[in-house]
Amino acid sequence: MPLPTIRVTRDEMRARVALFSEIEGFDGGLPDSDHPDARRTLYNVVGFQPPDGSDAATTSPVGAKAAEKAAIKISEGFNLGYCKARPGKGPMMHNHDTNETFIPMTGRWECSWEVDGKAETFELGPHDVISFPPGVQRRFMNATWDEPDAEHLMMFVIGGDGPKAEFSPDAMAELRDRGLVD
């Protein structure tokens, strides 16, 4: 049986085009947004609708602000975004209820995960790929140390239609200790 074919107008297709110069970046809306080591700008390119039933530790992977502003507003089983950060910056340890794949576009990035109480790390460069399964505590950080003032870009792809992010108990404890969350 052949796959169904649809026709779309140029205007309909334009709603599915995201020009980077037109995408608004956000630096808030996540539990760790005000932590000095977690400062970053997130761009919601495809999908990332707000998840149902969030609490302080559970949120959209792009944060509340960016989740409201997808450049391409679809729910078709995956979400795509970018993170821009300076060296030493990136999210605190967290997990997702779906797969998350990281692809550095520029710079060097450390991608870490927690196993048996310690962090393991791979350092990736442009166009390298790492794919974390659901439930693995993970984080990433710009590691382009030879360019201390430069922001670099990482693409991330997350499965599902309304994926959730949850910060680790240690991350939430540190955020509470700093007075950044209740």
Regions found by a protein language model. Give the residues of each.
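Short acidic-glycine-tyrosine-enriched beta hairpin
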Residues: 103, 115-134
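Conserved short histidine dyad/triad with adjacent acidic residue
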Residues: 61-68, 79-96, 134
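Short histidine-centered beta-strand/loop micro-motifs
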Residues: 68-73, 91-96, 113, 121-123, ...
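A structural connector/turn signal
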Residues: 80, 90, 99, 119, ...
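Short, conserved beta-strand element in jelly-roll/cupin
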Residues: 77, 82-86, 95-115, 158-159
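Histidine-centered metal-chelating micro-motifs
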Residues: 89-92, 110, 128-130, 134-141
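Double-stranded beta-helix
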Residues: 2-12, 137-182
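A short, N-terminal "cap"/entry segment at the start of jelly-roll beta-barrel domains
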Residues: 1-76
